[in-house]
Amino acid sequence: MTDRTQPHAVQVHTTAGRFGDTAAGTNRYADRGPSTSKVIAVITGLPIGGTLLLFAGLALAGTLLGLAVTTPLFILFSPVIVPATIVVGLSVAGFLTSGACGLTGLSSFSWVMNYIRQTHGSVPEQLEMAKHRMADVAGYVGQKTKDVGQ
């Protein structure tokens, strides 16, 4: 048996930077325009987000208008407890609806912006990068197997 107490050196070989950077430090994808999927995401995401923000604004305006109209009527023409319960319930429902639509719209905008700013390449580029990494790992494992066998 061989003595295994000696330390072994590990060699790491890299082929390219993580986010498409080349050895010169420039992005090789910078000269390209937005991909088709990004354009489609913007075209579909912005109207959806804008529509949801519009619904949030309409729900808020409707809630405030309803409160402005119904509060004096309830105070003048009916007992106190039932209308107060209805007013509070409707106002809470309106504000929650407005907030939910607003958060949904802002989340849509945030998702679109994150998708646009995404620095990863397209699927074929990611597959090519994965192939290179697998080839590097296979070469490393082969070299280590030869080293251990000697």
UniProtKB/Swiss-Prot annotation:
Keywords: Allergen, Lipid droplet, Membrane, Transmembrane, Transmembrane helix. It comes from the Eukaryota. Its main location: other. Coiled coil: none annotated. The keyword Transmembrane helix applies. It is found in: Lipid droplet; Membrane. InterPro entries: Oleosin. The chain crosses the membrane at residues 39-59, 73-93. May have a structural role to stabilize the lipid body during desiccation of the seed by preventing coalescence of the oil. Probably interacts with both lipid and phospholipid moieties of lipid bodies. May also provide recognition signals for specific lipase anchorage in lipolysis during seedling growth. Belongs to the oleosin family. This is Oleosin Ara h 10.0102. It comes from Arachis hypogaea (Peanut). The lineage of its organism: Eukaryota, Viridiplantae, Streptophyta, Embryophyta, Tracheophyta.
